[in-house]
Amino acid sequence: MLPDTLEGSIHDLTQNILADYTAGRPIDRIEPFNQPDRDVIIALIGKLRRIVFPGYFRDPAYHVYSAAHSLSALIEDTAYLLQKQIAIALRCGSSVTQEAAADIDRQAQEMTVRFLEKIPDVRALLATDLQAFYDGDPAATSLDEIIIAYPGLLAITVNRLAHELFLLKVPLIPRIMTEYAHGRTGIDIHPGATIGKYFFIDHGTGIVVGETTIICDSVKLYQGVTLGALSTRGGQSLRGHRRHPTIGDRVTIYSGASVLGGDTVIGHDAVIGGNAFITHSIAPGMRVSVKNQELEMRMMKDVNW
């Protein structure tokens, strides 16, 4: 039970905060049922991973009488939840008439079907990514280990799924998906980024890949790499313009390197050394490295710390 002094203040505190909600700012909206449900979208990621990797991430709710029966039930659940969330996202932030709502529901159903039709294409890309992980990491003992445990493959899986929704112009949901992966893995890949086959992320923590980045085939990124935009005063006026670099085939970028700018192209077969800061194009086959800083070594008895 609350102390008398605090209990007597609850009414006034409530009224003060309610009054603050009337200021008309974006943060003052009270429409919790007119926005996509993040928890449902996270649950959808789990269902989609089970569709993509049918031998892994089993849900005990689905009893496997046959692969077809199990998959049919899983796809039905996924389609139902996804089309509901897409419809909410399409309505979000706007007033919708009853007639328009019916059109939105039809559009959401069409988007859901078109997205699910892309699952085989996504799986084909992920099969190449899985092979790139295995070929590129001698510490990997099996493909099972990579699928189950590697954060890089989780981030890429979520991104490839979210990218298909992004291409369908589904609002909000692709970003919710990739930010979930970001929180789980420390790998921040915008759903708008275009990524080719055989993509390998080693370790991965701290990697940032911006919206208009183009990554070609067989690219390898190490932890802490940024494929970003140059900071300008353009702000929202730059939306829709190329702001992020293009990374050619078979490029390797080592830890801590930053490659920035929409006009920056890293040519095929180039290697970018750790901690490099690049804002201009690099020719194919080049090796870029930061000159080693000089190390000073002294005996501990001469060091006052």
What is the role of each PLM region?
Residues 165-197:
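Short, conserved active-site entrance elements at the starts or edges of catalytic domains
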Residues 282, 300-305:
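C-terminal functional extensions of proteins
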Residues 236-243:
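Regulatory activation segment
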Residues 1-176, 303-305:
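Terminal amphipathic alpha-helical/low-complexity segments used for targeting or macromolecular assembly
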Residues 185, 190-191, 196-197, 202-211, ...:
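Left-handed beta-helix
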Residues 161, 179, 226-228:
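Double-stranded beta-helix
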Residues 141-143, 160, 182-184, 222, ...:
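Residue-level signal for pocket-adjacent positions within structured domains
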